[in-house]
Amino acid sequence: MRILTVLLTVFATATFAQGKPNVLLIMADDLRDFGGAFTKEVVKTPNLDRLRARSTTFERAYVQYPVCNPSRSSLLTGLRAEQTGIVGNDKPLRQKLPDIVTLPQLCKEAGWQSHAFGKIYHLGGGNDVEARQRWVDAGRSWHSAQDFDATKEGRRMLAGRDITSGALKWCVWGAADGTDDDQPDGQIAAATVAKIQELGDKPWFIGCGFMKPHDPFIAPKKYFDLYPIDTLKPWRDPAETMPVRKESVGFGEYGKAFGKFTPQEWLELFRAYCAATSYMDAQLGRVLDALDKQGLWDKTIVIFVGDHGYHTGERQWWNKNTLFERSCRAPLIIAAPGMKGGQTTRSLTE
């Protein structure tokens, strides 16, 4: 199936029936689909469940490339990685394809108010404001684009640990002080809600790009409290499972560090990933509440998608970057006016 066929078919159908619908593209960073250690019985995502009740859930949605920038570039252009030439996180889309028309750009040029909050395109550029604007494609894809940082209070950890003693700088967890809005995803949700309220009846395309559960696995402490560590069990691969091969990206550095994890460290990191997921889910709920309050479900297409999957210890791996199911399969949930909710499909989706 061609990439984005499902999304654009839904989009075109709703446009034909009702004029310009609103489009809410919600992206989650490093959010895996269910399976392995990460099951519906373990992780608490009431707002994803709430969205699924209104939507079609695609259970076999596969990304083009299991790394953030290549996957997002493919999603937003409709091109595979061999066509975009983007196979890493080091180059912005326009450096490779200066004249490509992206999905939000298409909507912007067709009359939608187009705004982005958080991570829709990969957020490169470091602390250089102009570089970051180029990375998020401000001006071309969006009327406005904004990203966010944790506050001083949100950077204060009430508990936490560097699991690999510095070997992998990203492999840390932290139960943070402060409120949801002291972390970026809370600010992203608040800004998205404010923009929805501000735009009123104008047709809009809003990208709401949550940054969790991507590492570092930090969330307000109350989300860690949802997962008492003594209620979790370490994952054990079936005996016939093949581990990630040494030829995999970063295996030497990563594999050595992962191989030293004790069962307790595995539980700590898994708990933190679940906590970050539940934190993101709570922010999703705030955005869904805005659609409820504004009465927008009958004129809004909602697309929730992950940029790729993630291993949480399966095959002795804690990352993406592989071609295994856990890394290549991503969440995809679509709600649209006139679509029956609570449906699932196992049709292959790119």
Language-model regions: role of each:
Residues 8-17:
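Hydrophobic h-region of N-terminal signal peptides that target proteins for export
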Residues 1-9:
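Sec-dependent signal peptide recognition
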Residues 2-3, 16-350:
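Formylglycine-dependent sulfatase
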